[in-house]
């Protein structure tokens, strides 16, 4: 498998990447990695998925990006050969010791510390690493004073101790050891706000920490007032020999506990200049005396309070004021503390994107300074998890039901930090390089042609521009991604619990997305923008698309689904708050949304989330819509059963546990026995124990569109191929034909069973229809599918599609403000996904020229309008 470094990324630090293997080619976890000159590079490998025959489908690999450079080749090797270990883990009664060259760190088995006793070159660097959480309790009361009503808001904030309930060594290899810590925070004996922290310790001494916060508490009173990791560091030397640095969007900020300014006695100005350069000022009795008469700045904090502002502050006394010395727009999230012997640096991923965050150091002149990486910084307004109103609005504002369930209990968010303990002084350029490795890590991939040839993630097309219409379609696919990338910045879709998600529907009259309107605000995977972006990335290898897709998957896998409790594995439908809608469904949280990120990058947190989604089938019992009065369950063949199939198929390929395959095959067999297969129902009785679907007859007055537009076609076709199920593939084709036919034709071909059933616009089902046309060899049907799909975006008088903009105002400086007034994420995601898949299934029937397409549309105008127009 040939690998290349993704565009716009640098070959620095460690790379974790996925290998994809054709069925039957690789059996063992034994691989070799060669650089571009054919030299073998140290490699650590794991199997992440297998084919049904037991051969390797996906593998996870860790290697030095610096050594691999722009690319190389990954290949199977003889199973007897092993890598020479650069890192060793020794298990002892009271914990583990990890060593790599001159680096050493302890992982204690008991106590409050995650990590301890970190040394480099024989020098102690970090004494402790602990989770830190601050919880605020807010209450509002009305009081009467002198005849006046006064609203009194009281907020009490406490720092809660973290209790580690379990510690485990997940993996230990020649280059990396991964430890997992699960715990809770205690408030007066009550368990609050669980955490899961992974420490990935690399062979060069890099320590990467993925910290997941879970909400467990009372959303009416519990506010998040601070969350992060605190490092007990070790510094030596005089205060004027110590050094603090922050990375900013300008020059690196340098400071010291004691600055060598002194007005009563002339000091060599070169001393201050040397301090600023990070050079060690030699200790001297005279300087010690002078330092006693200078302020001692012991506390520093860089705070990113929004996506548009940061400040650097410091204070000399606990009860003294903060002084603000520098401000800017976007800090990249880097801090370092140094003395004459050592540097400990901290780098944070998505620092300003996931604001409010901070990097703080306390007691900088003391023996044990504390450095805290705040993922939610304490000076920000405590985060409020309450809903926006006391009722729901299912009729007026597109919210799901008339009952409330805006519950954040069980949702999560994950942040990443890296720590670099180094002997001596780490130069500014090295700090920036460290930050780049964390913010924009090296990603290694195969070419799109390789994934396409071996059908990774199902059916999708490679870009083609050999005809007028194909070239136009590719421009539209590019423009759609560009537009959403621009909207993230333009609309400031940033913040700890928001970053990565898109809004659902645009309101042209306000020139805003419907951020405050019920089910029209945050999208929460509605109509699978995840599938659109990941398939667009696979076919292009575009870094800008990868950035959108990765952020979307990281957000939706954590914030938009439940990770414990009675709704575990379910996700919340689109709403103004990510957890606000009463609809909790498996379609929002299914594993298929995130499989590409997991397999391409080996991200373990995404693996956790996909495992959590397995609980969705059982959790349906907690939801009134799925649970009937007698306690039995009902599901629709799509998007409910299709989402469960996504979860089960992912679990099966990761574990080869036959239970999950049997669940899928049971449902396929049950559907096969119905009069119309996937078109029957669409509601069935459901048994979460064995996956059994009970046919309960045909329904009228319902719509089938949700069966098709939530990834159903992609899930079923990939599952059919993985399991070799011709029955499922045929049912998809038959269903696609019913979606293609008009009402009278459907009634006739179904012998009246589908009378009164709505199937919706082709925007929902074009790829399923394309599968039907391909399987039946019906070229006329294929041409008509293209006419309908392309005609939803193209017209002779408006061929610009996603490239079009309308000016609605101007800034004071005359800069035009523009938008796409008809845009919606539903339409964008669906049109792009359908075009990508249909171009693979029925490529030859796509019209070649605009003249041909326009003539077809004039001859037979579409009955559907542009979605959202």
Label each region the model flagged.
Residues 1-4, 452, 481-518, 559-580, ...:
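Glycine- and aromatic-rich loop/turn segments at beta-sheet edges
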Residues 5-29, 220-234:
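Surface-exposed beta-strand/loop patches in extracellular or lumenal glycoproteins
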Residues 34-58, 385-396:
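Solvent-exposed beta-strand/loop surfaces of large extracellular or lumenal domains
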Residues 58-79, 401:
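Intrinsically disordered, low-complexity Pro/Gly/Ser/Thr-rich segments with frequent PxxP/GP/PP motifs
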Residues 96-425, 430-446, 499-505, 521-524, ...:
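Beta-strand/loop-rich accessory regions of lumenal/periplasmic or secreted enzymes
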Residues 209-210, 407-419, 523-549, 587-607, ...:
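Conserved beta-strand->loop/alpha-helix structural units within folded catalytic cores of enzymes
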Residues 333-335, 377-380, 386, 390-396, ...:
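Substrate-binding groove/exosite segments of carbohydrate-active enzymes
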Residues 427-449, 650, 654-662, 666-670, ...:
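Terminal, non-catalytic domain-edge segments
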